[in-house]
A protein has these predicted regions:
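Short, exposed beta-strand/loop patches in secreted or surface proteins that constitute
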Residues: 4-5, 24-26, 49, 91-95, ...
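Carbohydrate-binding surface patches
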Residues: 98-107
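Terminal (often C-terminal
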Residues: 59-98
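Extracellular jelly-roll beta-sandwich "head" domains, especially the C-terminal globular C1q domain
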Residues: 40, 52, 60-64, 87-91, ...
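Trimeric beta-solenoid/beta-helix "fiber body" segments of extracellular/virion adhesins
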Residues: 1-71, 113-115, 131, 171-173, ...
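Short, solvent-exposed secondary-structure boundary motifs
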Residues: 7-20, 36-44, 73-89, 137-151
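A broad, low-specificity signal marking well-ordered, structured residues that form hydrophobic/aromatic
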Residues: 22, 33, 49, 75, ...
Length: 202
């Protein structure tokens, strides 16, 4: 295995052995640099990952800016439940990959003042995009949050320009769920949601 520097249509720095090659290369055909490999003497060089100076990384032979992964973020947030005044659990975790946000919420109110307001979880980590690619969530756990007759009809919707999850009823999802709806149990019960959506400017 030996160290090589080459200059042909770009600058390449790499390690070469009898059957394998790894290299880092600036290229004249793109504004960035690639990390590549050759698996054997009988194979051709193949870029595995390209870092674009405009931002982001691409994979394989793809160097299109539109396809670059230009954002990755992990974090926590504090969701709130409308009409809740105190909490036992108030957990939120998210991962943002490119133009999608994936999240986990566990929330349980210990005190509340139910009203005719819609049942809404507020405080998502990013505002949703202003387009028709709507987001949503599914319930992976609910301890007596909804009655057995109402729970099957509940949808969790994230609309345009929103940082809220709204609970809706019915097969067409047009009716809002009020926090004092008698089909639902006290806000003191726990719910766990997972979901995803496109953020604004994502």
């Amino acid at each position: 295995c030996h160290f090589v520097v080459k200059n042909s249509g770009g600058t390449r720095i790499g390690l070469e052995g009898s059957s394998r090659r790894w290299y880092l290369e600036t290229r004249s055909d793109i504004d960035g640099f690639s990390i590549g490999a050759r698996a054997s003497n009988n194979s051709t060089d193949a870029p595995k990952l390209t870092v674009l100076t405009s931002g982001g990384i691409t994979f394989g032979n793809d160097t299109a800016t539109a396809n670059a992964l230009d954002d990755y973020e992990e974090g926590t947030f504090t969701p709130t439940l409308r009409d809740a005044t105190a909490y036992t659990y108030q957990d939120g975790d998210y991962t943002k990959i490119g133009d999608m946000v994936y999240f986990y919420i566990r929330i349980q109110a210990s005190a509340s003042s139910p009203s005719s307001n819609p049942w809404v979880i507020q405080g998502l980590p990013f505002t949703s995009a202003n387009d028709d690619v709507f987001g949503g969530a599914f319930r992976s756990f609910g301890r007596n949050v909804f009655s057995s007759t109402a729970s099957d009809a509940v949808n969790f919707h994230i609309g345009k320009n929103s940082s809220e999850i709204v609970a809706r009823l019915g097969s067409n999802g047009t009716s809002y769920v009020a926090t004092n709806n008698t089909s639902f149990v006290s806000l003191n019960e726990q719910i766990i949601l997972q979901g995803f959506y496109k953020p604004a400017g994502g």
